[in-house]
Regions:
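Conserved acidic
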Residues: 1-675
């Protein structure tokens, strides 16, 4: 769509080269969606000004929230948390309005520009983390390897590479070592033996000199730099995570706190919680501590270390060689990334901590080491994102760094499940602040389990804490005791349902007919119609939706089984009504039923339904959060058909044994959950 002299837009067709050339000549931005955008130097959007203002105010509120939280002021922390969330909602609402045809802000191209930019930024961060920390590259075919090497040869500043290699006497990899690196990254995607493509790559590498092979190996890759230059990398990390000595405090230590950036400030805050406590660096009373100078001195020493290794940093880590083929990255197999969302990338540094410290104990020394690698990732990611923004066309130096991803949290223990965006963890650090007591973090609808019976939810919460706290304290997790806890609840649910009770059934909601946008015959609303037409004449009709319901899984799942089930009903008129109701909707079986909670609680489960309730399926649904927790212990037995439940493996006597709570006092301690 191109605007004419009157501002009206018409469809035009151009060759892509002409389209790009036009953008370059007119100094326009080209978004990832290939939309052309006027830069703010030519015309700034009013909405952009509004969003920037909200961003500044939100950052201020987040800072106030952290200050209040650090001082133990829960009221103000909650107040500022709500304020910053409101600013976030206001900005996000603009994006939603761009999608709505009924809004005066409707703009069909804006939302795709926003989401694609976010996804690319996230892909850049995840791809970089894989290569930087794990030496893992997305070499999913032979051509990708050759094209990547060609790109490095084209974009690299070879004066900087030679200076770094010669200045630090870096190992110059052999052809065999480069090929080993390639095959390690390629092996998840294609066979690396007896393949002509491998020979093509090998011939390419054989034509390189030692400096070029070093660039192939070390470009954006700290893992392989360490593999072949271990002493150098250890010395580098020493300078970033070793606390300063009192006798080395520099005279201008306070001035250095003003000179360094936020990442270095966060690093030194992690190093000195014993001196800083919960206070901000500008707190006057901190100056009364004679050791306060260590903080600024460490800021200086970190800067000095970065300056010492600037030749390596400039040659290999802040270059034009940013992560490649981001559009294909979603199919990559990760070694470092453990979770990711639209605007976040969670990665592990446990192998680096083990390499540096010789152990993976959870203590303050190892937290400093972990934060050090988070610091390096944050610094290099900042460069990669700024380069990406520059590729879009942004020239304003300040605006180049507006798209950013900061090192926000450190989780000493992170438990990942097979469900996307479902994990639980403990949080030790937030933006440089070390918590005296670790916070508990839980994400994912299934793990939050808000629709579980309160008693089950309470034990589930305690189980998650037990797993996390045991690992944090270096204790073994008793899988046997965990299984007994799960089996105990499964037996209770089984006995309750077969006894006609409802306390462990999952709740649901049936809404008004107009609230369902898709085919209404396939929505929850038909449960209201079924109750009114079939069961209402006997058990009483229910009020118009919305209303609360209880979910029942019904075993008859074919026409034949349904006919056999209906033949058992004593009330033949009701059976006929069900037959007609199913026929009127072209259904052969019921499947899941949402029965009105008010009726079921007062009259009980209808006798026609009770014999065919799929008790195992209901147990599986109710206990699914427990099975997600079991997966973190590498115990997998859950499938769609409920072919194996924990109660099948643990007898009733075992489940209800006298020492069931031996799993840990945590499972009964009120400290582990917040009512």
């Amino acid at each position: 769509l191109e605007r004419d002299e009157h501002g009206d837009r018409d469809k035009r067709a151009y060759p892509l080269t002409v389209y790009v050339d036009d953008a370059v000549k007119r100094k326009l931005f080209i978004a990832p969606t290939l939309s052309q955008i006027l830069p703010p130097e030519q015309k700034e959007s009013l909405l952009a000004k509004y969003i920037k203002g909200n961003l500044a105010e939100r950052n201020a509120e987040k800072h106030k929230q952290m200050v209040a939280k650090n001082k133990g002021d829960g009221f103000r922390a909650t107040l500022h948390k709500n304020n910053q969330n409101n600013k976030k909602i206001l900005n996000n609402a603009i994006s939603g309005n761009h999608r709505s045809e009924h809004s005066h802000l409707f703009d069909q191209s804006t939302h795709p520009i926003l989401t694609s930019s976010c996804r690319i930024a996230n892909g850049v961060a995840n791809s970089h983390n894989e290569r930087f920390l794990g030496g893992n590259r997305h070499y999913f075919n032979v051509n990708v390897v050759i094209h990547h090497f060609t790109s490095i040869l084209e974009l690299t500043d070879w004066h900087l590479v030679r200076a770094a290699v010669d200045g630090f006497n870096l190992h110059q990899p052999s052809v065999e070592e480069v090929m080993a690196m390639v095959m390690e990254s390629a092996s998840p995607y294609w066979k690396v033996r007896n393949r002509p493509g491998i020979r093509n790559i090998e011939r390419f590498v054989e034509g390189m000199d030692g400096y070029e092979r070093a660039a192939m190996m070390y470009m954006g890759d700290l893992y392989h730099l360490r593999l072949y230059n271990e002493e150098l990398v250890r010395h580098w990390v020493d300078g970033l995570c070793t606390r300063a000595k009192p006798e080395n405090i520099i005279p201008d230590h306070e001035a250095w706190l003003e000179k360094v950036d936020g990442d270095i400030i966060n690093q030194v805050k992690v190093m000195y919680p014993d001196i800083l406590g919960r206070e901000e660096l500008d707190e006057p009373k901190l100056r009364e501590n004679p050791l306060f100078g260590l903080v600024g001195t460490s800021a200086y020493e970190i800067t000095r270390t970065l300056h010492e290794y600037r030749a390596i940093i400039n040659a290999f880590y802040v270059t034009k060689n940013i992560p490649f083929l981001i559009s294909d990255f979603p199919t990559s197999i990760r070694k470092v990334g453990v979770a990711s969302d639209t605007d976040s990338a969670i990665f592990t540094v446990q192998d680096w901590v083990k390499w540096y410290s010789g152990n993976m104990r959870i203590n303050h020394d190892n937290i400093i080491v972990a934060e050090t690698f988070g610091f390096l990732v944050s610094q290099t990611t900042t460069h990669n994102l700024a380069t990406m923004v520059g590729n879009i066309g942004v020239t304003n130096k300040k605006e180049k760094f507006r798209l950013s991803m900061k090192n926000e949290y450190l989780f000493p223990v992170f438990a990942l499940t097979s469900r996307a965006k479902h994990y639980f963890a403990n949080m030790a650090v937030q933006e440089g602040v070390v918590f005296k007591e670790y916070d508990f973090e839980k994400k994912g609808v299934e793990l939050i389990a808000s629709n579980l019976a309160p008693a089950i939810r309470k034990d589930h919460e305690a189980l998650l804490h037990y797993i996390i706290d045991s690992v944090t304290e270096g204790k073994e997790v008793s899988l046997h005791q965990v299984l007994r806890t799960v089996a105990k609840w499964e037996y209770r649910i089984h006995d309750s349902i077969t006894g006609g009770k409802t306390e462990y059934l999952k709740s649901a909601r049936v809404n008004e007919e107009d609230s369902y946008s898709q085919d209404r015959e396939n929505t929850k609303y038909i449960n209201y119609q079924m109750w009114q037409d079939v069961f209402g004449p006997v058990y009483g009709t229910v009020e118009q939706p919305p209303y609360s319901a209880l979910s029942f899984s019904i075993m008859p799942d074919t026409k034949k089984k349904t006919v056999e089930w209906l033949a058992t009903w004593e009330d033949r008129e009701m059976a006929d009504r069900m037959t007609k109701w199913l026929a009127s909707r072209n259904k052969t079986y019921v499947g899941e039923m949402l029965l009105p909670e008010s009726v079921i609680l007062s009259l009980g489960i209808p006798k026609e339904i009770l014999p065919v309730i799929d008790v195992r399926k209901i147990i599986a649904k109710a206990m699914s959060p427990f099975y997600l927790a079991l997966e973190t212990l590498e115990f997998y037995c859950f499938d769609n058909k409920q072919s194996k439940l924990v109660m099948d493996m643990v007898t009733r006597e075992e489940a209800f044994g006298d020492d069931i709570d031996a799993i840990d006092p945590a499972l009964e301690a009120d400290d582990y959950y917040d009512d």
